[in-house]
Every structure is written in C-alpha cells, then in structure tokens.
A protein has these predicted regions:
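P-loop NTPase catalytic nucleotide-binding module
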Residues: 1-3, 21-22, 90-201
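P-loop NTPase switch module centered on the Walker A-proximal segment
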Residues: 1-80, 84-88, 94, 109, ...
C-alpha cells in the first residue's frame, strides 16, 4: 500500500528533532527503509524502531510493513503496540488490505488514530472519505479538525454526552478513555510529504 506510511514516520522524526533531514522513499534515502532491497523496491519489508520526544512524552515509533506480502511481520508488531496510527490514502480510500489491518487492530485491541494522507491531491473528498470509514469499518470515526468535533465525540459514549450537554465540551481525560477503549478513532487529514496536518499526529 502506497499510503505514505514511511513518509509520515520520517516527518514525525524530523519535526521532533530526531532527524536532521527527512528522507524520501522515492529518492531511496529514507532513514527507516535502510535495507538495500527496501530502497530498491520502495517499500517497507521489515519493522523498524525509532525514538522521538515531544514536550509532554517520549515515544517509541514502530514503522511496520504496509504491503500485503509482508503482513506477518506487521501482525507480529501489532501485538506490542500501545497505540497505532493507521494511514489511508485520500485518493484510494478504504481498500481490502485496510479492512484486513482493521480486523487485526481490533483483534489485538489496539487504540487507533487515523491519518488520511495525500489530501493535497486532486479528487480527494474529506466528507466522502469519513463517510466511507464509517460505512465500511464501523462507528467512532471523528474528524478532529471539524467545527462540530466535540459534538461528534460526545456521540461516542454516555459520559462524554453528559459532559457535552452540561458544559458544551468533553474533558480530555474522557476523550483519552474513549480512544483507549476503541470507542473513538480520531481522524486527521493532510499530506505527509508536504508537511500538512502531520504535526497534529
């Protein structure tokens, strides 16, 4: 799947200061794709580990293969994740392999954020993509950039709804609990290559 997973990972390492310059898969100089065969084919074959920090926390990033041929390597990694970021191409939408990944994330009960990539390209439709996610994968997908974000979050749980009705907002701790329990899946839209929306993730 050419959704831009490694490009996003390189970008996260770059903005955190862990890389001086982000590599590019198409240029064959991606930091995370460091095996010759990976650079030759332009895909991730082996899971890689990298560390980066934000002002509030330290993170260990695991960049996993996205191609269907290397699903075993990816599934092995899922079993140790605290959280996952699932990348979807804005030009392709939900594919059959996306559904497979989603079933695995559900099986291993991994709280999941979504980054819908390549939104800078022609033909992408944010509303249509969000509707497709809900139709194909289920409920709980919320566009965290939308004006009605709080209302949509409130629909994901009783406690969240009570807080929203009383205060017009939902507490961060409640949102975190919804994400942890896989009742809420925050969605972010952008372009990893052009650094649009990437810093939010």
């Amino acid at each position: 799947m050419d959704a831009g997973k490694t490009t996003l990972s390189e970008g996260l390492l770059y903005v955190s200061g862990s890389l001086r310059k982000p590599g590019r898969v198409d240029h064959g100089n991606a930091f995370l794709d460091n095996y010759a065969l990976e650079r030759q084919r332009g895909i991730t074959i082996f899971a890689k580990q990298a560390r980066f920090s934000s002002p509030s926390a330290d993170f260990t990033l695991l960049d996993t293969p996205g191609h269907v041929d290397f699903s075993t390597e990816m599934e092995r990694t899922l079993q140790v994740l605290d959280y996952a970021v699932l990348l979807i191409s804005g030009t392709d939408g939900v594919q059959s392999h996306t559904r497979t990944l989603w079933r695995l994330l559900k099986r291993y009960e991994v709280p999941t954020f979504l980054f819908i990539n390549k939104m800078d390209l022609a033909g992408t439709d944010r509303a249509a993509l969000l509707a497709q996610l809900r139709q194909v994968l289920g409920e709980g997908f919320v566009d965290f950039d939308a004006e009605d974000c709080e209302e949509s979050i409130a629909m994901c749980g009783e406690e969240a709804m009570e807080e929203y009705l009383q205060n017009g907002s939902v507490k961060d701790t409640t949102i975190a609990a919804l994400i942890k329990s896989r009742a809420l899946f925050p969605c972010f839209f952008g372009s990893a290559l052009k650094q649009i929306g990437r810093s939010v993730v």
